[in-house]
């Protein structure tokens, strides 16, 4: 009788532990559309290739003219101010590199507009071929499908 009670209690404890572990874990991200996810990841790569190389003419083609860039420290910037900010970084801080943390990126479609991309990235200093002094920050990009291709219309950059 005592042995049966111990087995039952152990079974209940084991079952409740497995139940808690199974149902308390968040589900891993799975893109709604793999094609959309891959497209936005490619555009993100091209955007920051331009930023990291200081190619401002290329970089500004990734933004809509009505861009709103919200930065938790810098405040709100429009298209012209954003391009000026990137130009200043390219001129005065050309050693700055953006490094995307790919596993942090999620892309969700917004009906009749385009996707929202969220993720985490680092900005680092390139010194003698090594990335040092990296800061890790979060971002939200709202992409819009335009006649000229995918462009970012809204940016939220935070966690600085």
Protein language model features and the residues they cover:
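Bacterial N-terminal signal peptides that target proteins for export
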Residues: 1-10
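Beta-strand elements of well-folded, non-transmembrane domains
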Residues: 123-127, 143
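Hydrophobic h-region of N-terminal signal peptides that target proteins for export
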Residues: 13-23
């Amino acid at each position: 009788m005592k042995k049966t009670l111990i087995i039952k209690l152990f079974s209940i404890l084991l079952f409740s532990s497995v139940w808690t572990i199974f149902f308390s874990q968040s589900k891993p991200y799975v893109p709604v559309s793999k094609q959309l996810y891959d497209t936005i990841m490619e555009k993100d790569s091209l955007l920051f290739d331009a930023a990291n190389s200081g190619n401002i003419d290329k970089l500004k083609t990734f933004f809509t003219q009505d861009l709103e860039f919200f930065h938790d420290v810098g405040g709100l910037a429009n298209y012209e101010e954003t391009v000026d900010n990137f130009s200043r970084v390219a001129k005065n801080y050309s050693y700055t590199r953006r490094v995307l943390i790919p596993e942090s990126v999620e892309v969700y479609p917004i009906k009749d507009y385009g996707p929202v991309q969220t993720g985490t990235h680092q900005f680092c200093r390139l010194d003698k071929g090594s990335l040092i002094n990296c800061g890790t920050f979060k971002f939200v990009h709202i992409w819009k499908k335009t006649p000229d291709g995918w462009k970012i219309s809204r940016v939220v950059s935070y966690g600085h």
